[in-house]
Amino acid sequence: VRLQAALSTCPKGGTVYVPAGRYRTASLFLKSNTTLYLEKGAVLLGDNDRTHYPILPGVLPSENEVDEYYLTGWEGNPLNSFAGLLNITQVHDVVVTGEGTLDCDAQNGDWWVNPKIKRIAWRPRAVAMVDSENVCLHGITVQNSYSWTIHPIFVKQLDLLHFNINNPYNA
């Protein structure tokens, strides 16, 4: 809750700095013109209780109330899914950097048990990006993802630089 509050109130051009330590969290949502800096030894550890994650609808109506807007999905279909550990949705100029770790900790929950069966909603991604621009992930490690690790949809100018993905083969 505190980390999301810091992200939500971060001023334009500001940085949310996460020092070394382990921080249990569910879904975090970034906003435009901000940086999330994970110091070496900082671990954002995903919550193992799926009921702590918001459910995102697969499709939303657009502002003109005629067209639809794809928000999330499963296997290419617009289906309700849990929000990811890190969500970058309809924003621009976002940086996630440092030498810290996003650890979904999925192996210690039930995320990988019968993974093709929907339980409440479809599994989240570690980093979910939708309809965003100028996004950079730099230097971080992402591991033990619930399902897809890095999932960009309609993202322009995405830089993935010097980062690591560590997942078991059966994740």
Q: What do the predicted segments below correspond to?
A:
Residues 1-171:
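Extracellular/periplasmic carbohydrate-active domains that bind, remodel
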